[in-house]
Regions:
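C-terminal alpha-helical cap/extension of soluble enzyme domains
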Residues: 4, 9-15, 33, 37-39, ...
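General structural feature for long, well-ordered alpha-helical segments within catalytic domains
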Residues: 23-26, 30, 58, 62, ...
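Short, flexible micro-motifs
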Residues: 10, 44, 49-52, 82, ...
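Active-site beta->alpha loop and helix N-cap motifs at the rims of alpha/beta catalytic domains
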Residues: 2-142, 152, 258, 297
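Generic structural "secondary-structure junction" signal
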Residues: 15-18, 53-56, 147, 194, ...
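Secondary-structure boundary/capping signal
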Residues: 74-75, 133, 161, 184, ...
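Catalytic alpha/beta core domains of metabolic enzymes, predominantly
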Residues: 128, 139-248
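Charge-dense, low-complexity intrinsically disordered segments
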Residues: 21, 53, 57, 112, ...
C-alpha cells in the first residue's frame, strides 16, 4: 500500500489463555494468517485488543511480536492511547523504535478534554515524529473529534495524517474532507463501511477481519473499485455480524466470531464477562448467515 495507514488494517484481538495470560505464539500466528489472507496490516493494542487491561510489559511485547511476525510490506500500526500525553508519547517512541510505520492515537482517556487540551495532547505525541492516525471514539473517550477540531489538528499538527472515524455519523466524512482536506479518512466501524466507501476513503480499520479476512477483503476491493452492485448484497449478508463492532460487547462478539470459524478468540479479561447464552447463539446464527452467502452464491 502507499502508506502504512492505507488499506484494510485489522484491529487485532489479544489471545488470552485460560489463565488469562497472553498467548504470544498464537498472536504471532494470527498476524501471519491475516497477512496470508490478503489484509494490509494490524493494529495491536487498540480498543479491541483490550489495551486498558494489559500491563506495560504486555503492551510492549504485543507490538514487538506483531512487528516480528509481519512479513515484508505488511504494516503494524500500534494503538498508543493512554490517559495522558506523556504515556502516549512513550508508546509512540516504543512503536517507532521497534519498526512500526505509524501509530493510532485517541484523545486523552476518561477526561472530557477541551479542544485546546486535545490539541496539546496530539502536539505532544507528535514530537516523536512518527505518523499519527487520530482516532475518534466519543463513546469511550468522552471527547468528540468534530470536523472543526480535526481541521485545527490538521492545521497545527502536521504529523497527524489520517483519522479513524468511529462516530457512526456517515455525514462527517464530507465535512472532514471540506474542512481538513489533507487528512485521510479511514472507516472506523464495520457496520458503516459501505456507506462511507462511496465518499472516497483511504482505508478501513476493522474488527471482523479477525474472523473473516478473505470475505472482508473481497468486500473492500469491490467497494473501492466502485462495484456496488456486487458489494451491496455481500455487505447485507455481513451486516448483522458487522453491527456487533459498534456495540459495547464488540470484543466478546468478535472473539466468538473467531472461535466460530476455527480461529482462537478465547476469553476476555475483567471487567468484560462472557456474553449471555442468547447473545452467543445470535452471533453464531449471524455468522452462519454470512458464511452461507459466500458458500452458496
Amino acid at each position: 500500500m502507499t502508506n502504512p495507514w492505507n488499506g484494510v488494517l485489522t484491529a487485532t484481538a489479544t489471545p488470552f489463555k485460560s489463565d488469562l495470560s497472553i498467548d504470544y505464539d498464537k498472536y504471532a500466528e494470527h498476524v501471519a494468517w491475516l497477512a496470508e489472507n490478503g489484509t494490509h496490516g494490524v493494529i495491536p493494542n487498540g480498543s479491541l485488543g483490550e489495551y486498558q487491561v494489559l500491563t506495560a510489559d504486555e503492551r510492549a511485547k504485543m507490538v514487538e511480536v506483531a512487528v516480528a511476525a509481519a512479513p515484508k510490506g505488511f504494516n503494524v500500526v500500534p494503538g498508543v492511547a493512554a490517559y495522558g500525553a506523556a504515556e502516549s508519547r512513550k508508546w509512540a517512541e516504543h512503536a517507532q523504535k521497534v519498526g512500526a510505520g505509524a501509530v493510532m492515537l485517541l484523545p486523552p482517556n476518561a477526561y472530557r478534554a477541551s479542544d485546546d487540551e486535545v490539541l496539546a495532547h496530539y502536539k505532544e505525541v507528535a514530537k516523536v515524529g512518527i505518523p499519527i492516525i487520530a482516532y475518534n471514539n466519543p463513546f469511550d473517550t468522552k471527547v468528540d473529534l468534530t470536523p472543526k477540531l480535526v481541521a485545527r489538528i490538521a492545521n497545527e499538527v502536521p504529523n497527524v495524517v489520517a483519522i479513524k472515524e468511529f462516530s457512526g455519523d456517515v455525514r462527517r466524512i464530507w465535512q472532514i474532507k471540506k474542512l481538513a482536506p489533507r487528512i485521510e479518512v479511514i472507516v472506523g466501524a464495520d457496520d458503516v463501511f459501505l456507506e462511507l466507501s462511496t465518499a472516497g476513503i483511504s482505508g478501513w480499520i476493522a474488527g471482523f477481519p479477525n474472523a473473516l479476512p478473505k470475505e472482508s477483503m473481497e468486500l473492500y476491493n469491490l467497494a473501492i473499485s466502485g462495484n456496488f452492485k456486487e458489494a451491496a448484497p455481500m455487505y447485507a449478508a455481513l451486516h448483522d455480524v458487522f453491527h456487533w463492532d459498534s456495540k459495547k460487547e464488540f470484543i466478546q462478539a468478535i472473539k466468538l466470531g473467531m472461535d466460530h470459524v476455527g480461529r482462537y478468540g478465547g476469553p476476555t479479561r475483567l471487567p468484560r464477562l462472557p456474553l449471555p447464552q442468547h447473545e452467543q447463539d445470535q452471533i453464531h446464527r449471524e455468522m452462519d448467515v454470512a458464511l452461507a452467502y459466500f458458500k452458496n452464491r
